[in-house]
Amino acid sequence: MKIVLQHLTKKFPARGSVRGRKNREDVIAVNDFDFEIPDGKLIGLLGPSGCGKSTALNLICGLLKPTEGKIFFGEDDVTGLPPENRGVGMVFQNYALYPHLTVEKNIQFPLENLKGADKLSKEEMSKRVLEAAKLVQIDHLLERKPNELSGGQQQRVAIARALVCEPRVLLLDEPLGALDLKLRKDMQIELKRIQQRTGITFIYVTHDQEEALTMSDRVVVMNHGVIQQVGSPTDIYNEPVNAFVADFIGESNIIDGVMLEDCKVEFCGRTFECVDKGFGRNTPVNVVIRPEDLKIVYAGDGLLQGVVESIVFKGVHYEMMVRTQYFTFMVHSTMAESVGKTVGLSVIPFDIHIMHKSAEAQA
């Protein structure tokens, strides 16, 4: 189901006073959200803690009322509808399973609260529960209690419970945060499989950049309640629109530079070829280079020369800090250099990304 957010804003009254003032401006948790969520896709809401992503999720499900704007599910305006009438399922980091009920009864619980024309017979409920349990691969655990399950199994129960009512959209608020790294990665793959098999629109809140890039069809990057960029994981990583996105998504070297003309930029006292155009002449810009795009070469062969200040083994690569005259670069390489060694740095034009200074993250 397609979801459309039209100029969605949520303000909260400020509490207390500051330096003797009795009144403070309202806190804007979500500011002018205006974008469309395609039908049957997994959308990641990504941003640091306190950026408004959970507030946005609560607006979509109806737990909060927007201060301004509208929410459409398909062609239906659901802005004023309560959560139970929106056809949404929710999964939280806290699984909230009933400890005294079996897995089967936990999954069945929301079906027992259906009323009127939606009420199901016992046979229909049992069928729905079994289908949901099979989908998340826990149909062999239906007679167990939550305390007899692992963390990953408990998470699957919570997902099955959210899916058993056949929601139009599933909202997930950092559901894997309590799991260890290996299990979290396994569940990322599992959630993507479930989404693709059901065709339900998933909206997934996370502050984990790798998680968002791994799972999402499209990523919405947020900061201070404002959408910074919407795009595919590849676009978000390779073509960040501002310094905040570049710095928040993965690691970045962000250097002050001057765009001399199309495809030519100056930074760190040297002139480099790049592929960007349309910035005008002699325009101050931010230059973004990913650590993995910098290559360490012999000192005399690099456009930049520097000294290796530190080296850390990260498992798949070494992370080195190379101090040049103008900037200390982070470099990722599969080959380690010794601390104190003078090296050269090279980068190809395609890996030099240019952005306007005025396009930095809004605060």
Question: Where are these predicted regions, by residue range?
Answer:
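Helix-to-loop junction immediately C-terminal to a conserved catalytic motif
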Residues: C61
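The feature captures the beta-strand-to-loop junction immediately N-terminal to the Walker
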Residues: L46-P48
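Conserved ABC transporter NBD signature motif
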Residues: G69-D77
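ABC ATPase nucleotide-binding domain
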Residues: V4, E36, F72, G344-S346
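ABC ATPase nucleotide-binding domains
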Residues: G87, Q93, L97-F244
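Non-catalytic connector elements of ABC transporters
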Residues: S252, C263-A363
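Conserved coupling/switch loops of ABC nucleotide-binding domains, chiefly the family-specific signature
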Residues: T67-K70, H224, D256
